[in-house]
Amino acid sequence: KNYQVGSVIVRALRSVSINIEKNEYVAIMGPSGSGKSTLMNLLGCLDTPTGGTYILNGTDVSKMEDDYLAEIRNKEIGFVFQTFNLLPRYTALENVTLPLIYAGVPKAEREALAIETLHHVGLGDRMTHKPNELSGGQRQRVAIARALVNKPSIILADEPTGNLDSKTSLDIMGLLDEIHRNGNTVILVTHEEDIANHAARIIRLLDGTVHQDYINEKYKQKVVS
């Protein structure tokens, strides 16, 4: 993936070739400027590659128009961000229904789905609260519910615990672990080793290339124990 900054071409990713199978749990790591965010944007269909192909669930999405990419994002991918990205004037329930509105789900059905999903993430008693009435961990749970409500096959989590304390971070990672056990592919970007160790596979980027790609032995030990 290349970007033009003034008269300079910046090669954000170079000759990156990775294959992520259905129901994998993958952590993407690397220092600032390594290409983590660029790779996440490509995987999430928020951007398209300058060259090469991206096959998502059997479909080449690398040359698709924006409208098609938006439809794929809505149906196939759930996003969880470090800053939650909740609408401040909307309640938890209203925030979670948004992807269903874009998908054209009837009102009664989308409210029922949103309520069910909020219960699933442990916020059944906070549905009418707005973001400023919730703790950081509760806001991230709302964001996770919003990511899950359309039943996507892939969850992309970009520094999901970056704004949380250590105990709340463990709670949120426990929820992502459960989501993976329930059959979702989970891909998370993190700079924290303890967060990455929740994943079965770790991909380390350096200067826009895949520096390491390996099975996480600590995850294997956790599963065995």
Feature locations, PLM:
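ABC family nucleotide-binding domain
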Residues: K1-L205
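Conserved beta-strand-loop-alpha-helix hinge in the C-terminal portion
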Residues: T209-S225
